[in-house]
């Protein structure tokens, strides 16, 4: 049975800004890795463009087990972080285990923005997942954990132009690269395009004016494009894709065949 925790139950401590309005619009180097599309870290160099789901099995967590450590600065948010982890655990074969002395782990800490390494680092050792101001709602934590599991943004898929209209004229200056598409021959694309995915930003992401100008909208008119914080849950196909990537046993997260709209 799929288990969801609604986003609004976890808007605590004043960190309730939509992270799509606070993520970086540049590609700096953070901990020796390149920050791409605002919140994803990749090992700097030619491999950092090879994205969607991670391409190489070495970037998957062995046996689907992700070792983590939560910094003391996030103690008041530990419950919501664990609830987000349990959402993956309850619906996929991914497991999160608190670190004892393991060398390879996700270091969940308070940074100056929201970001995560995508998949397991080739280099090994600790890899950052930052939950700064505006990053501690349930949907955003699910999103950043999705990067740690191994997924890129849905709006960067090589086939995204079949499903999304990108309004380049509405993108704020310096943020255009956040809408670059993946290279089709350098990515592992899994499943159909999913408008409900927690890995898809909302219609106003990186907008010059988030009250007026959409930067993305569905090709099919009338379909909603909620922000990550508004979604606040994994979609059916988020779950299917994780299970496929990690070769999990079959799972039916929607008993009775109830599924959200997905453009196949």
From Swiss-Prot:
Signal peptide: 1-16
UniProt cofactor(s): Zn(2+)
Residues that bind Zn(2+): 143, 147, 153
Places the protein is found: Secreted
Disulfide bonds: 93-248, 114-135
Active site: 144
Function: Zinc metalloprotease. Provoques deadhesion of endothelial cells from cell cultures, and also degradation of fibronectin, fibrinogen and gelatin in vitro. Its role in the venom is not fully understood but it might act as a spreading factor that facilitates diffusion of other venom toxins. Alternatively, it might be involved in the proteolytic processing of other venom toxins or it might play a role in extra-oral digestion of prey.
Name of the featured protein: Astacin-like metalloprotease toxin 1
Protein species of origin: Loxosceles intermedia
